[in-house]
Amino acid sequence: SKLANHLSPEDRQLLEEHTDMVRQFERELKKSKADDAHPTPTLEEGIVEQNEQMPKISRMQTELLVSAFQADFTRVATLQFTNSVGQASMTWLGIQERQHTLSHKPNSDTDAQEKLTKINAWYASEIAHLAQRLAETPEPGGSGSMLDHTTILWTNELGEGNSHSHKDIPWAFIGSGLGFKGGQMVDAGGVPHNRLLLSIAHGMGLTNLSQFGNPDFCSDGPIQGLS
């Protein structure tokens, strides 16, 4: 108030508006703290980004993701395991060779194929764990579980590692968030994945979109029969 007495009417008005904004921000912070009823995940300390810690890091990232959804900090998240040329060794599965090296072995190499199957089964178990965590977490402010209102999209950037083929890339959808029908396998007949991404956009309510990425691959619209 002392400062306001030395200001012009115009500057006094600006000061009052700024003060009101700060007070409103304080009220929102207090309300946010009062509404903060979601549990904070308990994460093990001292976990560093090392190959052997990958299983623990996976579970920790999953807990952070579920907690972020539960608190409505975000509604979209990406969970990525290694990268396209990742050199992880799944030693906890008894496999010493690096996954990327194994992925370039020919299909006739039965030992490599068995190990890759074991590795992919581990990835699947981590996605299943994410789905289970969402399924056992009630939807905040709604009905059912968070999985009922979420869709997990699990995919890979290649259809086959040793040839770097982009054909027959697998896409798995888990959950009911987009309204897609579950419990089915769909052979899309080799159509560009742009059309699937367009289907996802439509499932999120963006039905005004007619293309996703290169328009040359979207002329036939979204893939039919998913919902």
Q: Can you say where each PLM-predicted feature lies in the sequence?
A:
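Ligand-binding pockets and gating/stacking loops
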Residues: 1-227
